[in-house]
Amino acid sequence: MKKRFERIFLIVMDSVGIGEAPDAKEFGDEGANTLGSIAEAFNGLHVPELEKLGLGKIAPLKGVKNVPTPLASYGIMQEASLGKDTMTGHWEIMGLHITKPFQVFPDGFPTELLEQLKSETGRGIIGNKVASGTEILDELGEEHVKTGDLIVYTSADSVLQIAAHEEVVPLEELYDICEKARKLTLAPEYMVGRVIARPFVGEPGKWKRTANRHDYALKPFGRTVMNTLEDAGLASIALGKISDIYDGEGVTKAVRTTSNEDGMDKLAEQINTSFEGLCFLNLVDFDALYGHRRDVIGYGEAIMAFDQRLGEILPQLGDEDLLIVTADHGNDPTHTGTDHTREYVPLLVYNKGIKPVNLGKRRTFADIGATVADNFQVERPSNGTSFLTELKPE
């Protein structure tokens, strides 16, 4: 049987949730609604392209009309995994269920872990808090250069980052330190998603992070749909953070991006390239620049900017292209704290030749992975239900 679509373009709007999940209370996220809160703060969101696709049919959003005949099929997805971080959400999208969440460290890392790291590296540690990579260099860069102590910090995601000046801690030593940290943080009580080497150069007031960053991620805890696509000789193109999130597993081509705008540019380039398979884009700015920083205005403006770019992309899609737009968790910028929020995520599925239908409430993000596998006739993941047959021709 011939595959339905030659190419599937999957866009994850990182952290763009659409209302509290049924288990939000267990995560301390009652009342969270990323899109709803932003729409209220703006007294109405102006997103004509998402509106035309059917965003207003998924949930009531101030300023977004519930159009009678949307261009896309639409629904809502609930996360089945026990976590609300980027890796968990993305791994589930490609067919895995995570039963033990990755740890986050809003108050810094435990003393025992740092003592082990000090003992194994012979270097002191400074920082040990949630911080932006540039701000912590301004704060501690000079002390690091004087003492040789490692700058250790984290974010709202499950990461342990180690910054060091390349003339103080040679690159090979920094990489060796990060490998030691990676081994230590595999322990269940720590279970960190990623360890990141963050080398920098320069002098006080003029610090500059170099391109020698290196990520020590965890490989997915099982095979994903991306692996099965690669095995079948199909494309599995990773744009933005996607390759890092899956530690390169099942990736046939990786393209780095510098921003949401750059991500959409890179997506447009792939649309104009001939391939058969999946092109998977993560737009991280929503989460990293606005959600965690609780910048509701910046977040709303970024959504409206994305909407405009979406309007440019849609006419470029061919008859055999399928576009899926979704998210990996929430991050309500009006919610308490700075962490992600446990929410439903939107699901919009567009092809110019299919009749729009209500895809309903999906019980797992893995329904996307199952649909991708179903379309390309590769092995389906053990989790998820394909909605391919629900996408009927006009």
Swiss-Prot record:
EC number of this enzyme: 5.4.2.7
Q: Does the keyword Disulfide bond apply?
A: no
GO molecular function list: magnesium ion binding; manganese ion binding; phosphopentomutase activity
Q: What class of enzyme is it?
A: isomerase
* Cell compartment(s), UniProt: Cytoplasm
Specify the domain of life of the species encoding this protein: Bacteria
Bound cofactor: record note: Binds 2 manganese ions.
Query: An example Gene Ontology cellular component term from the record?
Result: cytosol
Biological processes annotated in GO: 2-deoxyribose 1-phosphate catabolic process; 5-phosphoribose 1-diphosphate biosynthetic process; metabolic compound salvage; nucleotide metabolic process
What does the entry list as the binding residues for Mn(2+) 2?
A: D287, H292, H340
UniProtKB keywords: Cytoplasm, Isomerase, Manganese, Metal-binding
Q: Which reaction does it catalyse?
A: 2-deoxy-alpha-D-ribose 1-phosphate = 2-deoxy-D-ribose 5-phosphate; alpha-D-ribose 1-phosphate = D-ribose 5-phosphate
Q: Required cofactors, per record? A: Mn(2+)
Fetch the InterPro entries from UniProt. Alkaline_phosphatase_core_sf (IPR017850), DeoB (IPR010045), Metalloenzyme (IPR006124), Phosphopentomutase_DeoB_cap_sf (IPR024052)
Cite the binding residues for Mn(2+) 1.
D14, D328, H329
Would I find tRNA-binding among this entry's keywords? Answer: no
List the HAMAP family.
Answer: Phosphopentomut (MF_00740)
Give the family per the record. Answer: Belongs to the phosphopentomutase family.
Return the protein name: Phosphopentomutase
